[in-house]
């Protein structure tokens, strides 16, 4: 691999193997991350699970249908501004606003992810690319302490690979991103279980009394910036895989993970 590509992969490894959203939230709120969950009611988990699935469905139906496929630089600042605005509203109303605010934020984020994918040479007309964009939402955090072995980038890709392939075939056969197909429902459920962890962290931070509308905007800005970084890293890996082959990139990725101290058990 050329040196510039090795450096790009090194940056991607750091982003994908050491997501920093929780730490960023703690900095915004000025409180330890461990205190966040105390700000949420016990009933929040069901509401968050329902909202994340709804948001991913909405994003899959809407966001990439309006994206152009001509390669150009990703316009991340516009999407951040839009997400921050929706977060200001959500920060004022908390959990009650989640069913409205989260789908809006997720659609904005998926459009931004598609923008990044296109800039890295992906074809947004390809259903597999659409689903690879959606897959980014599963790459942003752990499901729990017991999930460490399954949280590495390639581990998550491997866990989702069958569902992504089946969903891509479903979309090709139907000609549209149809709602309600069993394979799509299964894939969205898998992604939502991981996306929901980050959503919970976001909502818990917004529920801290000192946050308010301004803090809600800051949290949503960090939220979309987090997934933009994940997307940039994810599609950097995919670009390098197209150039050098998957095996070469995987070997280089694992070597860098070891050197940087991020190595996990290989699944």
Positions of PLM-derived features:
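Short hydrophobic alpha-helical segments that form membrane-spanning helices or hydrophobic packing faces
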Residues: 101-105, 216-219
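Terminal, membrane-proximal amphipathic helices
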Residues: 1-86, 111-267
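Glycine-rich active-site/cofactor-binding loop and its immediate structural neighborhood
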Residues: 82, 86-100, 107, 111
């Amino acid at each position: 691999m050329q040196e510039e590509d090795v450096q790009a992969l090194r940056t991607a490894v750091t982003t994908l193997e050491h997501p920093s959203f929780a730490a960023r939230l703690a900095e915004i709120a000025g409180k330890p991350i461990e205190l966040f969950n105390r700000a949420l009611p016990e009933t929040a988990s069901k509401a968050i699970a329902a909202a994340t699935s709804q948001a991913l469905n909405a994003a899959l139906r809407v966001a990439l249908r309006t994206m152009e496929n001509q390669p150009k630089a990703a316009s991340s600042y516009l999407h951040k501004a839009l997400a921050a605005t929706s977060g200001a509203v959500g920060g004022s109303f908390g959990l009650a606003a989640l069913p409205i605010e989260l789908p809006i934020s997720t659609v904005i984020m998926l459009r931004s992810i598609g923008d990044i994918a296109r800039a890295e040479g992906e074809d947004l007309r390809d259903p597999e690319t659409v689903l690879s964009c959606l897959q980014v939402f599963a790459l942003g955090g752990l499901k729990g302490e017991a999930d460490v072995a399954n949280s590495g980038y390639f581990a998550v890709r491997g866990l989702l690979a069958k569902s992504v392939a089946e969903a891509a075939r479903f979309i090709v056969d139907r000609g549209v991103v149809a709602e309600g197909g069993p394979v799509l429902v299964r894939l969205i459920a898998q992604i939502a279980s991981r996306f929901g962890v980050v959503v919970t962290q976001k909502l818990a931070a917004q529920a801290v009394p000192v946050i308010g509308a301004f803090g809600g905007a800051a949290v949503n800005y960090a939220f979309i910036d987090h997934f933009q970084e994940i997307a940039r890293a994810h599609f950097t890996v995919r670009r390098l895989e197209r150039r050098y082959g998957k095996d070469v990139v995987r070997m280089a990725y694992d070597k860098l993970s070891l050197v940087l101290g991020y190595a996990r058990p290989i699944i």
